[in-house]
């Protein structure tokens, strides 16, 4: 019997391959999950390691943030910045600050997706260095600002939801590093030129106020879940129903690939943990070196996968929490949010990718070294 492949089949296969090429982290997670079944045969235990609460909370937050963006909230805020600040240095400071503080609520990825495109338009005529340096500062600010809250980035959410961290302990662990980071970033804006810039008066973008109220209420529901007042699944169901009824197209804007990546890593870690030799090796490697190992691991595989890989093999959750957050500094892949900025900048007119990457790397490793020195000083 002869098998024939139609054009539709070939086109479908090309789309699937293109999807996996575009989702490198998901592809790697899927391969690792499948390979891990060579260590341990498929069983219910592998899927018992899946943290459903984390997946529910991630989904709810991504849907709510997509809703807030669709209301024009972030465009409205950005327009307000443009209207009130007249110098390049002042704009750099405010844009960096917006990324730093907004990332605590809307995540580092979304903060960069929101403010970097605006930066590229606003500072297009400010000179190559001013534009690159502002985007670098925004990227670092989003990565480090997001560490201050359990919902700021996926690794925080996972550790907070799965390891029973108290909110007070969480904040106490990271607050000194966030404060020092913000001060250093503020000083970094002094490298920007201080000349005044003339900007045309523009009307502020309209806000969809009815939907804005809805998504702010849903954000409050998510925060109640983070504070452990409501179960995560309740928040996910409430958000899913509200979005499906009010704005169903937003469900397509949820990062389903990120959720699938988490699922694959949960399965991988469950199988690895069940293999005595591997689990004992990882436990010995981590003991007493949680922060440093997490930083180094993040440089290679990014901090979210590093968290999922290392978390089951240590009881020192605060050390790991600190390591995977500081580990977002360093290489371009240390935090996948950094790739967002790089791609956005790389598409801009006159982009100097090599120079940007050099500036990014020097700034990241310089700040990482200073913060690791602070870790040593604080003991």
Model-predicted regions and their roles:
Residues 3-5, 14-45, 57-72, 191-194, ...:
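Structural signal for alpha-helical transmembrane segments and their membrane-water exit/capping regions
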Residues 16-22, 44-54, 165-177, 204-209, ...:
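Interfacial loop-to-helix junctions that mark the boundaries of transmembrane helices
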């Amino acid at each position: 019997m002869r098998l024939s492949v139609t054009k539709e089949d070939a086109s479908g296969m090309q789309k699937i391959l293109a999807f996996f090429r575009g989702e490198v982290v998901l592809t790697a997670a899927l391969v690792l999950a499948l390979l891990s079944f060579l260590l341990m045969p498929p069983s219910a235990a592998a899927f018992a390691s899946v943290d459903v609460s984390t997946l529910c909370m991630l989904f709810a937050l991504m849907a709510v943030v997509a809703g807030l963006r669709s209301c024009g909230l972030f465009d409205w805020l950005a327009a307000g910045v443009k209207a009130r600040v007249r110098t390049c240095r002042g704009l750099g400071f405010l844009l960096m600050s917006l990324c730093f503080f907004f990332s605590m609520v809307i995540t580092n990825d979304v903060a960069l997706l929101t403010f970097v495109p605006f930066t590229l338009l606003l500072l297009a005529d400010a000179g190559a260095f001013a534009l690159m340096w502002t985007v670098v500062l925004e990227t670092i600010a989003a990565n480090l600002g997001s560490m201050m809250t359990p919902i700021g980035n996926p690794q925080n959410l996972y550790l907070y939801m799965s390891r029973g961290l108290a909110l007070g302990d969480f904040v106490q662990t990271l607050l000194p590093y966030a404060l020092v980071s913000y001060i250093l970033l503020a000083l970094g804006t002094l490298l920007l030129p201080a000349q005044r810039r003339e900007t045309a008066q523009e009307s502020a973008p309209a806000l969809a106020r009815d939907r804005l109220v809805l998504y702010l209420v849903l954000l409050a529901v998510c925060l109640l879940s983070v504070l452990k007042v409501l179960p995560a699944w309740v928040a996910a169901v409430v958000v899913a129903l509200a979005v499906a009824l009010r704005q169903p197209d937003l469900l397509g804007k949820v990062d389903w690939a990120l959720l699938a990546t988490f699922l694959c890593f949960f399965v991988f870690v469950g199988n690895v943990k069940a293999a005595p030799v591997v689990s004992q090796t990882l436990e010995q490697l981590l003991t007493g070196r949680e922060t440093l190992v997490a930083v180094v691991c993040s440089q290679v595989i990014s901090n979210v996968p590093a968290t999922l890989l290392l978390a089951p093999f240590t009881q020192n959750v605060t050390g790991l929490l600190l390591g995977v957050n500081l580990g977002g500094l360093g290489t371009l892949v240390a935090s996948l949010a950094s790739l967002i900025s790089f791609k956005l900048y790389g598409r801009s007119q006159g982009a100097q990718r090599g120079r940007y990457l050099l500036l990014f790397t020097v700034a990241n490793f310089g700040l990482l070294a200073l913060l690791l020195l602070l870790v040593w000083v604080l003991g």
